[in-house]
Amino acid sequence: MYKTSNGQAIKLGKELGKGGAANVYLHASDKSKAVKIFKPEILQKEVNLAKRIEKLNQLAQIADIEMPFGNAKKTIGAWPKDIVKDLSGNVVGYIMDTVNGGIDLAFIVGARDPTTAFLKYRSDPNYSSWLNYFLYQGRGLKNRFVLSYYLSLYFDKMYKLKAKNGARIELDICNFDIKPKNILASIENISGHNHIVPYILDLDNLTLKDIKHKLSPSSAQFTQEYRAPEGPIDKYYDYWSLAVLFYQLIFNQHPFDAVLGGTRFSDGTERDFFIKNKCFPWGRNRKFLSVGTQNDFRHGNFLKISSELQHLFIRAFDSDLPSQRPSMDEWSRGLLDFLQNNSVQFDRLFRYK
Ligand SMILES: Nc1ncnc2c1ncn2[C@@H]1O[C@H](COP(=O)(O)OP(=O)(O)O)[C@@H](O)[C@H]1O
Ligand SMILES: [Mg+2]
């Protein structure tokens, strides 16, 4: 049995998903709400969890966290709305809005084969629209650029948070544990048009820093594939994770996968080793590198995107300093320029085999 901050009982409905830290359920008597319940071992470590949830809840009341889609506005993530306590009064989780009809980006990133993509969700009413929108080919490719573009706008907003009245909020938020599983995308009909609408999840993991205080999880979650070489510190760490995600959405390949080390880097094939040694296939060491024959066409598609976007990827994965990685603002401009370039034929742009 669980309770809200003012003592109302919460009954858990069906499970919506789970991650490394928690399970998320539908609220049994209010399906518009989702309930995140942390695992005991996480609660033991996260002594300031209640404080962070409270702070995020307050922030959600005052900050402009909406994006326009057609004539509607969507909240850009699942923000904590209330804490959840167990019967002895310990904080064990929080309540947020349910994201309906969303698919996590891990499925979109890997959606290459129409016979297996989204198969787990074959009976979901959205199955065919996900196939239609996100399959890694022709039309799906353009939508993956669109998705990356929206995400760059979303995160730009997060890093330059403003109040609803437009005043800047003096607060840095970073270390989102950005990875496909922490982002959902749904196709929503808004006044007669279908829009791809992303949602950022797992917001409890982030760090909030103002001039006086820093509020962060005692053991921030991270995921190796999205972890920048320097580890989670600031927004530049997130810029790395986001660039990996954009690369995966666009090229259906992790930037450091299927890269071979040639002579100079022959002592390691681990992805981590390549990341640390600046072995991005299009970076400074490219003359020492090759890409695996099976997958080379995927990295090879890099040459088909605009040089503006190529440079953003190179800066993201091959800069000397984390602060040289492109900002979300630069990504959104680069992606929009490419999307608006009428001479780009997205359905014929890439090789898929
Ligand atoms: N508001 C929500 N609406 C719908 N599904 C959600 C929501 N929040 C989380 N989920 C699902 O639950 C999974 C785990 O949630 P998450 O907050 O990422 O937990 P963890 O901190 O353990 O990673 C997500 O990957 C997603 O599939
Ligand atoms: Mg998660």
Identify the residue ranges that each predicted region occupies:
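ATP-binding glycine-rich phosphate-binding loop
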Residues: 1-41, 72-79, 86-88
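Conserved structural core of kinase catalytic domains
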Residues: 75-145
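Catalytic-loop of the protein kinase fold
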Residues: 147-148, 155-195
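Activation of the activation-loop gatekeeper triad in protein kinase-fold domains
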Residues: 201-207
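Conserved activation segment of eukaryotic-like protein kinases, specifically the C-terminal portion
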Residues: 213-233
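Conserved C-lobe activation region of Hanks-type protein kinase-like domains
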Residues: 246-307
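Terminal C-lobe "cap" of eukaryotic-type protein kinase domains
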Residues: 317-344
